[in-house]
Amino acid sequence: MRKNSFEILTATMMGMTYEEVENAVKENAVVLFPVGVVEAHGPHLPLGADIFASLNQAIEIKRCFDDAGRSCVIAPPFYFGGTQAMTRQFAGTFTSAKDTIVASIKEILESLDRFGFQRTVFFNAHGDDVQKKAMLKAIIESNEVLKMKSYWPEYEDDILYQGFKGDEDYLLKIASFQLEGAFDIEKWPEDEFDIHASAFETAMMLDICPDMV
């Protein structure tokens, strides 16, 4: 991320004027939509680690679009998602009911459709099943009624593991790679169950937001 402390706002449509949004629509811009939650990530990571990660992914993809001369915008991040994990027991973990998430996401997609955008791609960095099922329900129901279509990225190697058949029209298949190979990680035996706020997420946050670790 750039050093600008307001980038979580200015890198998205929140830093654009309405005329810039209109021009992006005319350019057939793709919408990148970061989603996540605000939840406890141990004493060493910020509550917003998931949304910082998904927003960083969107920012990096936007740079690729810019370099290729293609238009895209980043929607304001949605971070009041759901969690059923034990992080609910910690101060600072916000969680929403599935129906609340579905309704909120559908209304956001309806707005993007009303602006005139044609395609939206989600970027999710939170693995809780409540979150994923709510997002997918919102995508499926929105795709049935909106002109704009939304897509959920999934690594090819994880498609069946994540419960997909592989032929879903909203599924955006992306090439798999060893995530942990993206960072220099030294693991201890107790890190083998590296799911939440452990070696990988810590390395990731050191890479994108070092001042927060």
List where the protein language model places each region.
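Extended, histidine- and acidic-residue-enriched regions that form the cofactor-binding/catalytic faces
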Residues: 1-121, 125-213
